[in-house]
């Protein structure tokens, strides 16, 4: 049986994946920018917001880097890469993923 926090993270990832799939099928919705040899898209931010919103609904006291305007103090911190493989996504190469992890007092727990 999957643990509750992992189950909630999986649901958040699925919600983000739906948005990625929608945008992947509609390249006209993707805005691409680059800096320092890195590629960024609007989809990265949109998916991050979807995932953080889903997780924050269940865990409002947890810390979400890039999602918290002011750094809160909590033992739980979520690490989110909303679109791992952005270059592939931007080039319409279907090799990309969502990565979500949770740490407790600096140690990976999920």
Residue spans of the language-model regions?
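N-terminal subdomain of lithium-sensitive/metallo-dependent phosphomonoesterases centered on the IMPase/IPPase/PAP
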Residues: 1-83
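DPxDG-like acidic metal-binding loop motif
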Residues: 74-110
């Amino acid at each position: 049986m999957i643990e509750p926090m992992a189950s909630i993270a999986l649901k958040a990832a699925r919600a983000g994946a739906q948005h990625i799939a929608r945008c992947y099928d509609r390249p006209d919705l993707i805005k691409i920018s680059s800096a320092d040899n890195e590629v960024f898209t609007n989809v990265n931010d949109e998916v991050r917001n979807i995932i953080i919103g889903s997780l924050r609904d269940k865990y409002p006291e947890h810390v979400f880097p890039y999602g918290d305007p002011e750094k809160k103090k909590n033992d739980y911190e979520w690490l989110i890469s909303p679109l791992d493989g952005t270059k592939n996504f931007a080039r319409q190469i279907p090799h990309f993923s969502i990565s979500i992890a949770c740490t407790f007092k600096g140690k990976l727990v999920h």
